[in-house]
Swiss-Prot record:
This protein's UniProt keywords: Amino-acid biosynthesis, Aromatic amino acid biosynthesis, Lyase, Schiff base
The enzyme's E.C. designation: 4.2.1.10
Molecular functions (GO terms): 3-dehydroquinate dehydratase activity
Name of the protein: 3-dehydroquinate dehydratase
PROSITE patterns: DEHYDROQUINASE_I
Gene: aroD
Organism, as annotated: Escherichia coli O9:H4 (strain HS)
Function noted in UniProt: Involved in the third step of the chorismate pathway, which leads to the biosynthesis of aromatic amino acids. Catalyzes the cis-dehydration of 3-dehydroquinate (DHQ) and introduces the first double bond of the aromatic ring to yield 3-dehydroshikimate.
Pathway where it operates: Metabolic intermediate biosynthesis; chorismate biosynthesis; chorismate from D-erythrose 4-phosphate and phosphoenolpyruvate: step 3/7
Length: 252
Protein backbone atom coordinates (compact mmCIF):
# COMPACT_ATOMS: atom_id res chain seq x y z
CA UNK A 1 0.00 0.00 0.00
CA UNK A 2 1.30 3.42 -0.87
CA UNK A 3 1.62 6.06 1.81
CA UNK A 4 0.71 9.74 1.56
CA UNK A 5 3.37 12.29 2.49
CA UNK A 6 2.34 15.80 3.47
CA UNK A 7 5.20 18.09 4.45
CA UNK A 8 7.41 15.64 6.40
CA UNK A 9 4.51 13.54 7.69
CA UNK A 10 4.10 10.04 6.24
CA UNK A 11 0.47 8.98 6.57
CA UNK A 12 -0.12 5.24 6.36
CA UNK A 13 3.13 4.15 8.03
CA UNK A 14 3.73 3.54 11.73
CA UNK A 15 1.26 4.61 14.39
CA UNK A 16 -1.96 6.39 13.34
CA UNK A 17 -1.49 10.13 12.97
CA UNK A 18 -3.41 12.50 15.25
CA UNK A 19 -5.67 15.12 13.67
CA UNK A 20 -7.10 17.97 15.74
CA UNK A 21 -9.91 20.25 14.65
CA UNK A 22 -9.84 24.00 15.19
CA UNK A 23 -13.32 25.54 15.31
CA UNK A 24 -13.36 29.32 15.56
CA UNK A 25 -16.00 31.86 14.54
CA UNK A 26 -13.80 34.78 13.51
CA UNK A 27 -10.23 35.82 12.76
CA UNK A 28 -9.49 36.91 16.33
CA UNK A 29 -10.53 33.51 17.67
CA UNK A 30 -8.66 31.71 14.92
CA UNK A 31 -5.52 33.51 16.07
CA UNK A 32 -6.01 32.84 19.79
CA UNK A 33 -6.96 29.19 19.22
CA UNK A 34 -3.97 28.68 16.93
CA UNK A 35 -1.62 30.00 19.60
CA UNK A 36 -3.19 27.64 22.15
CA UNK A 37 -3.01 24.67 19.78
CA UNK A 38 0.63 25.30 18.95
CA UNK A 39 1.79 23.68 22.19
CA UNK A 40 -0.30 20.50 21.75
CA UNK A 41 1.08 17.16 20.54
CA UNK A 42 -0.64 16.34 17.23
CA UNK A 43 0.25 15.71 13.59
CA UNK A 44 -2.36 17.39 11.36
CA UNK A 45 -4.37 20.57 11.93
CA UNK A 46 -7.91 20.47 10.55
CA UNK A 47 -9.57 23.84 10.19
CA UNK A 48 -13.33 23.38 10.43
CA UNK A 49 -14.33 26.27 8.20
CA UNK A 50 -18.06 25.62 8.72
CA UNK A 51 -17.66 27.21 12.17
CA UNK A 52 -16.34 30.44 10.62
CA UNK A 53 -19.06 33.11 10.53
CA UNK A 54 -17.96 35.28 7.61
CA UNK A 55 -17.97 32.76 4.77
CA UNK A 56 -19.34 35.25 2.25
CA UNK A 57 -16.02 37.08 2.34
CA UNK A 58 -13.45 34.75 0.76
CA UNK A 59 -10.64 37.19 1.58
CA UNK A 60 -11.52 36.94 5.26
CA UNK A 61 -11.53 33.13 5.08
CA UNK A 62 -8.10 33.08 3.44
CA UNK A 63 -6.75 35.65 5.90
CA UNK A 64 -7.68 33.20 8.66
CA UNK A 65 -6.00 30.37 6.75
CA UNK A 66 -2.87 32.51 6.47
CA UNK A 67 -2.82 32.99 10.26
CA UNK A 68 -2.98 29.22 10.76
CA UNK A 69 -0.22 28.63 8.24
CA UNK A 70 2.03 31.25 9.83
CA UNK A 71 1.35 30.14 13.41
CA UNK A 72 2.04 26.45 12.73
CA UNK A 73 4.07 26.35 9.51
CA UNK A 74 5.33 22.83 10.13
CA UNK A 75 1.87 21.26 10.55
CA UNK A 76 -0.06 19.95 7.54
CA UNK A 77 -3.24 22.03 7.21
CA UNK A 78 -6.50 20.28 6.30
CA UNK A 79 -9.24 22.64 5.07
CA UNK A 80 -12.68 21.25 5.95
CA UNK A 81 -16.12 22.66 5.41
CA UNK A 82 -18.39 20.06 7.00
CA UNK A 83 -21.86 20.43 5.51
CA UNK A 84 -24.95 20.49 7.71
CA UNK A 85 -26.21 17.29 6.10
CA UNK A 86 -23.09 15.49 7.36
CA UNK A 87 -23.06 17.00 10.84
CA UNK A 88 -21.53 20.42 10.21
CA UNK A 89 -22.50 23.86 11.43
CA UNK A 90 -23.84 25.43 8.24
CA UNK A 91 -25.83 24.46 5.19
CA UNK A 92 -24.26 25.44 1.89
CA UNK A 93 -25.13 25.05 -1.78
CA UNK A 94 -23.06 22.64 -3.83
CA UNK A 95 -21.84 25.55 -5.97
CA UNK A 96 -20.69 27.55 -2.95
CA UNK A 97 -19.09 24.45 -1.40
CA UNK A 98 -17.04 23.73 -4.52
CA UNK A 99 -16.11 27.41 -4.94
CA UNK A 100 -14.90 27.60 -1.33
CA UNK A 101 -12.72 24.52 -1.73
CA UNK A 102 -11.33 25.83 -5.02
CA UNK A 103 -10.47 29.13 -3.35
CA UNK A 104 -8.61 27.22 -0.64
CA UNK A 105 -6.72 25.25 -3.29
CA UNK A 106 -5.87 28.43 -5.21
CA UNK A 107 -4.60 30.16 -2.06
CA UNK A 108 -1.56 27.92 -1.72
CA UNK A 109 -2.14 28.00 2.04
CA UNK A 110 -3.61 24.53 2.58
CA UNK A 111 -2.02 21.11 2.17
CA UNK A 112 -5.24 19.09 2.07
CA UNK A 113 -8.95 19.61 1.55
CA UNK A 114 -11.81 17.50 2.86
CA UNK A 115 -14.26 16.68 0.07
CA UNK A 116 -17.55 14.98 0.90
CA UNK A 117 -18.22 11.92 -1.26
CA UNK A 118 -21.91 12.66 -1.75
CA UNK A 119 -21.41 16.18 -3.11
CA UNK A 120 -22.10 14.91 -6.64
CA UNK A 121 -19.92 12.57 -8.68
CA UNK A 122 -18.94 15.03 -11.42
CA UNK A 123 -18.18 17.86 -8.99
CA UNK A 124 -16.13 15.53 -6.80
CA UNK A 125 -14.06 14.19 -9.69
CA UNK A 126 -13.41 17.68 -11.07
CA UNK A 127 -12.40 19.04 -7.66
CA UNK A 128 -10.04 16.13 -7.02
CA UNK A 129 -8.34 16.76 -10.36
CA UNK A 130 -8.14 20.49 -9.61
CA UNK A 131 -6.62 19.85 -6.17
CA UNK A 132 -4.04 17.42 -7.53
CA UNK A 133 -3.08 19.87 -10.28
CA UNK A 134 -2.23 22.32 -7.49
CA UNK A 135 -0.39 19.73 -5.35
CA UNK A 136 -3.17 19.62 -2.74
CA UNK A 137 -4.17 16.25 -1.28
CA UNK A 138 -7.80 15.18 -0.89
CA UNK A 139 -9.35 13.50 2.13
CA UNK A 140 -12.68 12.24 0.76
CA UNK A 141 -15.24 11.77 3.49
CA UNK A 142 -18.61 10.43 4.49
CA UNK A 143 -20.31 10.83 7.88
CA UNK A 144 -23.46 9.31 9.32
CA UNK A 145 -24.37 10.61 12.76
CA UNK A 146 -27.39 8.30 13.02
CA UNK A 147 -26.40 4.76 12.14
CA UNK A 148 -23.81 2.27 10.94
CA UNK A 149 -24.59 0.53 7.63
CA UNK A 150 -23.62 -3.05 6.84
CA UNK A 151 -19.93 -3.80 6.28
CA UNK A 152 -20.50 -4.28 2.54
CA UNK A 153 -21.88 -0.74 2.25
CA UNK A 154 -19.01 0.74 4.29
CA UNK A 155 -16.50 -0.96 2.00
CA UNK A 156 -18.43 0.12 -1.10
CA UNK A 157 -18.26 3.78 -0.03
CA UNK A 158 -14.53 3.58 0.71
CA UNK A 159 -13.88 1.87 -2.62
CA UNK A 160 -15.90 4.53 -4.42
CA UNK A 161 -13.72 7.22 -2.82
CA UNK A 162 -10.65 5.32 -3.96
CA UNK A 163 -12.05 5.05 -7.50
CA UNK A 164 -12.51 8.85 -7.47
CA UNK A 165 -8.76 9.14 -6.74
CA UNK A 166 -9.07 10.38 -3.17
CA UNK A 167 -5.65 10.42 -1.52
CA UNK A 168 -7.23 9.31 1.77
CA UNK A 169 -10.77 7.87 1.96
CA UNK A 170 -12.47 8.60 5.31
CA UNK A 171 -15.69 7.37 6.90
CA UNK A 172 -17.17 8.13 10.34
CA UNK A 173 -20.28 6.34 11.57
CA UNK A 174 -22.52 6.37 14.63
CA UNK A 175 -22.94 3.03 16.38
CA UNK A 176 -26.30 2.05 17.84
CA UNK A 177 -24.72 -0.94 19.57
CA UNK A 178 -21.34 -2.47 20.32
CA UNK A 179 -21.83 -4.84 17.39
CA UNK A 180 -21.95 -1.78 15.12
CA UNK A 181 -18.42 -0.95 16.28
CA UNK A 182 -17.32 -4.45 15.33
CA UNK A 183 -18.97 -3.99 11.93
CA UNK A 184 -16.93 -0.83 11.34
CA UNK A 185 -13.70 -2.49 12.48
CA UNK A 186 -14.34 -5.60 10.36
CA UNK A 187 -15.08 -3.43 7.31
CA UNK A 188 -11.89 -1.45 7.94
CA UNK A 189 -9.82 -4.63 8.13
CA UNK A 190 -11.38 -6.10 4.99
CA UNK A 191 -10.88 -2.85 3.08
CA UNK A 192 -7.29 -2.62 4.26
CA UNK A 193 -6.42 -6.23 3.44
CA UNK A 194 -8.32 -6.72 0.18
CA UNK A 195 -8.98 -3.42 -1.58
CA UNK A 196 -7.05 -0.42 -0.26
CA UNK A 197 -4.01 0.79 -2.17
CA UNK A 198 -3.75 3.97 -0.10
CA UNK A 199 -4.28 4.99 3.56
CA UNK A 200 -7.85 5.07 4.87
CA UNK A 201 -9.36 6.69 7.96
CA UNK A 202 -12.33 5.11 9.73
CA UNK A 203 -14.02 5.64 13.05
CA UNK A 204 -17.04 4.66 15.07
CA UNK A 205 -18.30 7.64 17.04
CA UNK A 206 -19.56 8.35 20.57
CA UNK A 207 -18.39 6.64 23.75
CA UNK A 208 -19.35 3.25 22.34
CA UNK A 209 -16.95 3.68 19.44
CA UNK A 210 -13.91 5.01 21.30
CA UNK A 211 -11.98 1.76 20.81
CA UNK A 212 -12.03 2.41 17.04
CA UNK A 213 -10.18 5.69 17.59
CA UNK A 214 -7.40 3.87 19.41
CA UNK A 215 -7.02 0.62 17.44
CA UNK A 216 -6.32 2.03 13.98
CA UNK A 217 -2.91 0.43 13.69
CA UNK A 218 -4.45 -3.00 14.39
CA UNK A 219 -7.37 -2.76 11.95
CA UNK A 220 -6.02 -0.42 9.29
CA UNK A 221 -7.03 3.18 9.99
CA UNK A 222 -4.16 5.59 9.31
CA UNK A 223 -5.29 8.54 11.43
CA UNK A 224 -7.54 9.44 14.32
CA UNK A 225 -9.06 12.61 15.72
CA UNK A 226 -8.26 13.97 19.18
CA UNK A 227 -9.34 17.02 21.14
CA UNK A 228 -7.12 19.88 22.27
CA UNK A 229 -10.05 21.73 23.79
CA UNK A 230 -13.62 21.14 22.63
CA UNK A 231 -14.23 17.85 20.82
CA UNK A 232 -15.37 18.25 17.20
CA UNK A 233 -17.25 14.95 17.26
CA UNK A 234 -18.72 12.67 19.93
CA UNK A 235 -16.22 10.23 21.42
CA UNK A 236 -13.00 12.19 20.87
CA UNK A 237 -10.43 12.00 23.65
CA UNK A 238 -7.62 14.38 24.53
CA UNK A 239 -4.53 14.39 22.33
CA UNK A 240 -2.33 13.69 25.35
CA UNK A 241 -4.19 10.51 26.26
CA UNK A 242 -4.51 9.56 22.61
CA UNK A 243 -0.77 9.81 21.94
CA UNK A 244 -0.03 7.72 25.03
CA UNK A 245 -2.35 4.89 23.95
CA UNK A 246 -1.26 4.96 20.30
CA UNK A 247 2.38 4.77 21.36
CA UNK A 248 1.71 1.85 23.71
CA UNK A 249 -0.08 -0.08 20.96
CA UNK A 250 2.61 0.77 18.40
CA UNK A 251 5.43 -0.42 20.65
CA UNK A 252 3.69 -3.55 21.95
Amino acid sequence: MKTVTVKDLVIGAGAPKIIVSLMAKDIARVKSEALAYREADFDILEWRVDHFADLSNVESVMAAAKILRETMPEKPLLFTFRSAKEGGEQAISTEAYIALNRAAIDSGLVDMIDLELFTGDDQVKETVAYAHAHDVKVVMSNHDFHKTPEAEEIIARLRKMQSFDADIPKIALMPQSTSDVLTLLAATLEMQEQYADRPIITMSMAKTGVISRLAGEVFGSAATFGAVKKASAPGQISVTDLRTVLTILHQA
